[in-house]
A protein has these predicted regions:
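C-terminal catalytic ATP-binding subdomain
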Residues: 1-13, 44, 134-143
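Charged docking surfaces used in two-component/phosphorelay signaling
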Residues: 35-43
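Receiver (REC) domain active-site loop signature in two-component systems and cognate sites
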Residues: 78-81, 123
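Active-site beta3 strand of CheY-like receiver
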Residues: 67-73
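Hydrophobic/aromatic residues positioned on beta-strands within the core alpha/beta folds
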Residues: 104-106
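A Lys-centered signature of the CheY-like receiver
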Residues: 129
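Helix N-cap/capping motif at the beta->alpha junctions
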Residues: 29, 50-62, 83-86
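Disordered, acidic interdomain junction associated with two-component signaling
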Residues: 1-25, 88-96
Length: 143
């Protein structure tokens, strides 16, 4: 009974967020972390597109039509191009949607200075790893 009640509560929350069909670019170089966040987001009927480093993320945003992505979850420490540099590059793209696209840092580093640096690079917020479901839902409620 308790498990059933928790399941029903989870489903009600997912439906109330109205995220079905939203498209999120998840930028994460660690396969296990990518799998975890993808599974969490797919539970909300979100379309997840993966990128495995910052350069790949910038290239995907560049190649996409305006308004294609609803949100970007961006790891910070990655090879090739880190998340902060990728956020700066996305913000420089000459498209209005690239200035407005929500970019949320995902990082195990959650000190005030880390959050400040993420925001200074053009990101809109910061989620600490491991992902807190309440905070994830707060972010998802805004797309």
């Amino acid at each position: 009974e308790i498990a059933k009640e928790q399941y029903n509560t989870k489903n009600a929350k997912q439906e109330s967020l109205n995220t079905e069909g939203k498209r999120i670019l998840v930028v994460e170089d660690n396969d296990l972390n990518m799998e975890i966040i993808t599974t969490l987001l797919e539970d909300y009927k979100i379309i997840v597109e993966p990128a495995y480093n910052g350069k790949e993320a910038v290239d995907k945003v560049k190649a996409s039509p305006p308004g294609y992505y609803d949100l970007v979850f961006m790891d910070i420490m990655m090879p090739v191009m880190d998340g902060k540099e990728a956020a700066r590059e996305i913000r420089k793209l000459p498209r209005k949607d690239c200035q407005e696209l929500p970019i949320i840092a995902m990082s195990a580093n959650a000190f005030d200075e880390d959050v400040k640096q993420s925001l200074e690079s053009g990101m809109n917020g910061h989620l600490s790893k491991p992902i807190d479901m309440r905070k994830l839902e707060e972010v998802l409620s805004q797309i």
